[in-house]
């Protein structure tokens, strides 16, 4: 590599400089404090671990986004975490092994081999919260509410939410006896809203099931979609009707708590279909092609760790929230310039100032007073009348 190229970073990998790094860190602390106030406990997971553990229950999408390396000590394949959820699920199922509900949260960098979308970061700072041990819509509403509180804390404006339920499609596909290949083809067609493909793939099914699967393309819009779904899917299996009931219960609670929040329903939206088992949700803002926060229910993710506990949660990228948020993050302003001196009294004074939360920068040998300005100092320590005093910086 030529010297001129050594400063280049890989596509989608970025460094964060001051003061943006300080804004992100302050926001991280604020969000974790918010999570704690809701009863969520922080966990810290490994950056890298054996691949079979990292991808357990996570589906093919996560496999494709995971950087893989060979462990030089064991010779086993390892992966850098691309998502916290499988790791947190292992902690709940195998390590904590609590009988009752467990609320866990996290914040840290993840690494993606492939970007989520064009021009998106491959090294986001993922933060999120997960609730294990309760299968009711109440838990889904809780994590959605915490997600909205996170967006409110960072002052992300003009949000709207998409809601769906993968159990609706899964129940219809199971009733139709679709093979794995056809189920995947139909899934792909539904995501693209391809009416002709959906029609062709369901043409040979029993009339009622074919009509209900085709209806999923059109069952998208406002609150009225849920009432329409009750009619058009009225002959669906009990599991599908139960999924509709759950979605309605969640929508009712959200509408009560957030009457100004636009809710959009799409019963053909199957985000995370490979591992989600129930409600799925995502938040969008104008001007962003991808969701800025997302989540759902994934009751089976802990099965490979010995406990298939009910689970629901959400995640978001902290760097995106700080970029989009309008909240003013107040950074510590100014500082105190400390002269280069071996005076013990000066050192005691500096220690006291720092303990009080003051920012004190020491001059290095040969540095002129003008260097204090580059260090963002507006005051200085000067010895007067036999003691060190903090005075305005003189130019």
From Swiss-Prot:
SUPFAM superfamilies for this protein: Class II aaRS and biotin synthetases (SSF55681)
One GO biological process this protein is involved in is: L-histidine biosynthetic process
Compartments, as annotated in UniProt: Cytoplasm
Record bears the keyword Amino-acid biosynthesis? yes
- Source domain of life is Bacteria
- What InterPro entries does this protein map onto? aa-tRNA-synth_II/BPL/LPL (IPR045864), HisRS-like_core (IPR041715), HisRS/HisZ (IPR004516), HisZ (IPR004517)
Per the record, the pathway is:
Amino-acid biosynthesis; L-histidine biosynthesis; L-histidine from 5-phospho-alpha-D-ribose 1-diphosphate: step 1/9
Keywords assigned by UniProt? Answer: Amino-acid biosynthesis, Cytoplasm, Histidine biosynthesis
Matching entries from CDD domains are given as: HisRS-like_core (cd00773)
GO terms under cellular component:
cytoplasm
Q: Which Pfam families match?
A: tRNA-synt_His
Q: Does the keyword Disulfide bond apply?
A: no
Q: Give the family per the record.
A: Belongs to the class-II aminoacyl-tRNA synthetase family. HisZ subfamily.
- Complexes and interactors: Heteromultimer composed of HisG and HisZ subunits.
PANTHER family linked: HISTIDINE--TRNA LIGASE, HISTIDYL-TRNA SYNTHETASE
Q: Please, what other remarks does the record include?
A: This function is generally fulfilled by the C-terminal part of HisG, which is missing in some bacteria such as this one.
- Primary role: Required for the first step of histidine biosynthesis. May allow the feedback regulation of ATP phosphoribosyltransferase activity by histidine.
What is the official name of this protein in its record?
ATP phosphoribosyltransferase regulatory subunit
Organism of provenance: Pseudomonas putida (strain W619)
């Amino acid at each position: 590599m030529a010297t001129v190229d050594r400063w280049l970073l890989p596509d989608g990998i970025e460094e964060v400089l001051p003061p943006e790094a300080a804004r992100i860190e302050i926001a991280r602390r604020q969000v974790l404090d918010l999570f704690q106030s809701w009863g969520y406990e922080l966990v810290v997971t490994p950056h890298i671990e054996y691949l079979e553990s990292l991808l357990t229950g996570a589906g093919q999408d996560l496999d494709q986004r995971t950087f893989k390396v060979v462990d030089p000590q064991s010779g086993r394949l390892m992966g850098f975490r691309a998502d916290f959820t499988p790791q947190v699920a292992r902690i709940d199922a195998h390590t904590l092994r609590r009988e009752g509900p467990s609320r866990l949260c996290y914040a840290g960098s993840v690494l993606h081999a492939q970007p989520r979308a064009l021009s998106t970061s491959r090294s986001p700072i993922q933060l999120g919260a997960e609730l294990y041990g309760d299968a009711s819509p109440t838990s889904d509403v809780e994590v959605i509410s915490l997600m909205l509180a996170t967006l409110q804390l960072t002052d992300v404006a003009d949000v709207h939410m998409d809601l769906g339920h993968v159990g609706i499609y899964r129940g219809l596909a199971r009733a139709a006896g679709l093979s794995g290949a056809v189920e995947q083809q139909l899934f792909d067609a539904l995501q693209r809203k391809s009416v002709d493909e959906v029609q062709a793939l369901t043409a040979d099914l029993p009339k009622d099931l074919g009509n209900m699967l085709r209806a999923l393309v059109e069952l998208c819009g406002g609150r009225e979609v849920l009432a329409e779904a009750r009619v058009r899917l009225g002959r669906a299996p009990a599991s599908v009707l139960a999924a509709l009931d759950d979605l309605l219960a969640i929508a009712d609670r959200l509408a009560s708590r957030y009457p100004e929040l636009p809710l959009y329903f799409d019963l053909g939206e199957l985000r995370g279909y490979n591992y989600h088992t129930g409600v799925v949700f995502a938040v969008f803002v104008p001007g962003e092609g991808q969701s800025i926060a997302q989540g759902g229910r994934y009751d089976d993710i802990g099965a490979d760790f010995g406990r298939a506990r009910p689970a629901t949660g959400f995640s978001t990228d902290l760097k995106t929230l700080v970029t989009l948020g309008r909240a003013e993050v107040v950074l510590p302003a100014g500082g105190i310039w400390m002269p280069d001196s071996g005076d013990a009294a000066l050192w005691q004074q500096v220690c006291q100032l720092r303990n009080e939360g003051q920012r004190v920068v020491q001059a290095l040998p040969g540095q002129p007073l003008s260097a204090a300005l580059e260090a963002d100092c507006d005051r200085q320590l000067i010895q007067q009348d036999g003691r060190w005093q903090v005075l305005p910086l003189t130019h």
